[in-house]
């Protein structure tokens, strides 16, 4: 059972396709979505696999507790991420699905706005509390669940025209909110994205759902026959992407090592130290600041920035 949890943020730099395979809808290759809300997500399995690949390619030496190890040490990776033959034992490091927090939408003023909604904010707050975190700015608790729909951060927004925001071709009347201002400043500190207080707006749950369905990037792709210079038969398809600037969050989860004999626990065999804490320490030491997630890696898609909860910059 997991004993420790560490939140982290995923800031999409280039459009990201975490796909579900082919479907019969309008888009041939849609992105992953939650079944009950329709909100975009990245499955934990895909996130974990991408993270493991980065660890396996990094030969940097790090200190975990009082022992030193290479990040790509096979024994350590198998103990944390799990062995290739899963029947032997489970890994001590897990991940949750990456959930949407802020979604970028074209704005008449300020180029684009970050939109979210009360449902997303309330769920984010609940999950942070479950993980043992606090949402406070300078010692002041932020009432996220009290932030209403159709609001903007008081005094900081740069996407408003009078008291309205124009997103795509839709106009929304907004009201200033002090709690949203505090939350936006707090989130900017945690993610390192300084423009959040100037661009964030809270819409209704239904309006948010419409935008995350209708304002993703859908790209038409083709394959050219080198001999004829024309499109090959059946080689025209559409592919959906989460747009650049999208912000998601996930949790790294740690448990004690799933080995009975101390000598089989590798660097995590440190009497007097919490094994789950050592697993998180290894993750924090080896996690990448920039990595690739999802499909189309060879055409530059899916580049993201990873920001741990504890990081200051």
Feature map (PLM): residue ranges:
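Basic, Gly/Ser/Thr-rich N-terminal segments that form RNA-phosphate-binding interfaces in CRISPR RAMP
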Residues: 1-313
């Amino acid at each position: 059972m997991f004993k420790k949890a560490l939140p982290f943020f995923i800031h999409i730099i280039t459009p990201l396709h975490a796909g579900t395979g082919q479907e019969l809808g309008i888009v041939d290759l849609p992105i992953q979505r939650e079944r009950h809300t329709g909100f975009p997500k990245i499955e934990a399995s895909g996130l974990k696999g991408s993270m493991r690949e980065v660890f396996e390619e990094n030969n940097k030496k790090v200190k975990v507790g009082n022992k030193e190890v290479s990040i790509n040490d096979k024994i350590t990776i198998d103990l944390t991420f799990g062995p290739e033959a899963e029947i032997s034992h489970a890994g001590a490091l897990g991940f949750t699905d990456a959930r949407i927090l802020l979604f970028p939408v074209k704005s008449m003023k300020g180029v684009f706005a970050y939109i979210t909604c009360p449902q997303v904010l309330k769920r984010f707050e609940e999950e942070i509390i479950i993980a043992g975190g606090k949402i406070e700015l300078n010692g002041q608790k932020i009432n996220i669940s009290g932030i209403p729909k159709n609001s903007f951060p008081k005094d900081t927004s740069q996407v408003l025209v009078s008291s309205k925001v124009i997103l795509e071709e839709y106009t929304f009347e907004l009201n200033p909110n002090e709690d949203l201002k505090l939350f936006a400043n707090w989130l900017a500190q945690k993610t390192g994205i300084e423009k959040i207080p100037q661009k964030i707006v809270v819409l209704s749950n239904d309006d948010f759902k419409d935008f995350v369905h209708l304002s993703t990037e859908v790209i038409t792709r083709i394959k050219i026959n080198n001999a004829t210079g024309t499109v090959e038969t059946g080689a025209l398809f559409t592919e959906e992407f989460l747009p650049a600037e999208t912000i998601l969050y996930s949790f790294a989860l740690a448990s004690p090592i799933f080995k009975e004999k101390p000598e089989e626990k590798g660097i995590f065999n440190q009497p007097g130290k919490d094994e789950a804490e050592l697993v998180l320490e290894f993750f924090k030491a080896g996690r990448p600041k920039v990595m690739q997630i999802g499909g189309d890696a060879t055409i530059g898609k899916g580049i993201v920035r990873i920001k741990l909860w504890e990081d200051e910059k």
